[in-house]
Amino acid sequence: MYKRILTIALSALTVCASYAQSTWMGNPFASKGKIVAPVLESFLVDEIVIVSDNPGDWKFTASLENDGEKEIISISMDAPTEAPPAKFNVYFTFPQKGVFNFWSSDLHCGTHLDPFWGLTNASSSLAYRMPLYEYFDDNNRNCLTIACSEVLRKVDAVLGIMEEGCAICSELRFFRESEAPAKHCETKILLDKRPVFWSESIREASDWMAQVNGYEAFPVNDSAFEPLYSSWYQFHQDVNAEAIEQECRIAADLGMKTVILDDGWQTTDGNRGYAFCGDWKPAPQKFPDMAAHVAAVHDLGMKYLVWYSVPYVGWHSDAYKKFEGKYLYNDHVSSCGVLDPRFPEVRKHLVDLYVNALKDWNLDGFKLDFIDSFKFRGEDPAVKENYAGRDIMNLSEAVNVLMKEVSSALRAIKPDVLIEFRQQYIGPAIRQYGNMFRAADCPGNAKDNRMRIASLRLTSGSTAVHSDMLEWNISETPENVGRAIINSIFGVIQYSTMLRNIPQEQFDVMRKWMKFASEHRETLLKSEFRPHHPELGYPVIEAESDTELIIAVYQDNAVIDVPRRGKSVYILNASGSDSIVVRCGSKTRTVKVPCGDWKSLN
């Protein structure tokens, strides 16, 4: 395979002087700032430009490695003394030829192509999405995948159509928020233009991001793939030991293996918000003996996880005064302070909380929430204090250290501990600390659940991907209960219905699908995963193992292709119709599959 390596190393001042007279006719980024490295000539895109408004004493090194239909851009920055890193941008374009859609890890981002108007349309950081983007056509083929190795610090992306000439413009912006002084920084950008199935390039780019950073995923055990019950949607903060045990008896009979006790166990206040978080002691009126309560649930054959909002210390907690001066900011909507993990005593406090709970109550794991609230709102408070008391200057690094300390301490006590994180803190860095990634909250929204699960499956490797908690009205039809379950079937399903209240016909649907999900778990959750047409909301999703092919259909009038092979084939129908058109080679036929049900074609 043809391979070319171009390496250029010039100081920012030299490069700026050298290119000061260049007008770069036809280049849309000629006036975007000072050019701090020579233009990189790419085989996959047009010229790659690196600019900075104020490079100061920082010197830039840029290199480009081409390997057929993939390229890696490497950028290094060095300063003679420690200084806040210079902001810089990387620009490139390519013709809009066959490009109709766009994908990013942002669950709120559609697949449409935005105009290139200089507005950030995709951001990422350690606990917020991933710097991973793809342009693709209308036939599930990749046109260009872009990935960045910088998964800790914030990266802003401006991606879209430049009106003049109808070109795809891509701009990645680095160091756009407060950053601790440093002497060396580096990043890599992967470009992949292979015309492969769109999700293949996403999956491989995600693996590359982990590999280039040397990340190893948190161990995943079989318990992470078992169906579970969550208290959140039905109870909210109105939880107590007796009610949870009652629900768990029903859940265990249905086949659920784990329960997550969500918010409310630590307070008698029912006003939502987080004013009473921070002390993390069970409310005695609700949970008079937490250890005995957990033991009772264990006796049912279920594991027990407890929710914590990691960074929040409520204004009405005893802990709030203890950590005065050690907050990133105060959240006046949620009535709490957000801890600054750059203080070693803050990290120790949080680690001790979870370690003690694991030991004292014999828990099986945790739902660690709101990691994405570790951020700045305005200026970094450490700057005016000259980082006093902080043993880590960079916030992202501190969050990284905190979560490593938490996960290591818990694994030392219980090697098979379960730790759940919520979308949008996802990706290779977060996979180091947890083994369950849940789709972000979308109560009652089956389509969003399906789409969020699909996105997580592409970027989570072997980590167990969970649905957002399933709920439905007790008057719902059995068919639509089945459709809700099929929309989440390619993730571990979390249920959050009030089990004591649902009618028998809904129980029957749940039991039927739990049996199917258990019997086909390897294929549904661990085998090759192919979600078709993200621009249409994934109307067809396939999972295939060595022995079977499972195809879920979510759209009326869809035609699904079934290859001629000896594998077992199952059709799952969430389309709203009672028939599916199946094509095998040149022949088509209509197969009767009841809405909300499944059928074997063998």
Over which residues does each language-model region extend?
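Aromatic- and acidic-residue-enriched carbohydrate-binding clefts of CAZyme catalytic domains
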Residues: 265-290, 317-344, 373-400
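Bacterial Sec-dependent N-terminal signal peptides
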Residues: 1-23
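An acidic-aromatic substrate-binding cleft motif
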Residues: 209-250, 254-258, 266-267
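Glycine-rich, aromatic-flanked loop segments that form ligand/cofactor-binding clefts
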Residues: 198-216, 258-263, 285-334, 416-420, ...
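N-terminal accessory beta-strand-rich subdomains and adjacent acidic, glycine-rich linkers
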Residues: 22-209, 215, 562-570, 574
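Active-site-proximal substrate-binding groove within the catalytic cores of carbohydrate-active enzymes
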Residues: 180-184, 402-602
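Active-site groove signature of glycoside hydrolases
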Residues: 255-265, 350-384
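Active-site-adjacent "subsite" loops/lids of carbohydrate-active enzymes
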Residues: 219, 226, 233-237, 303-360, ...
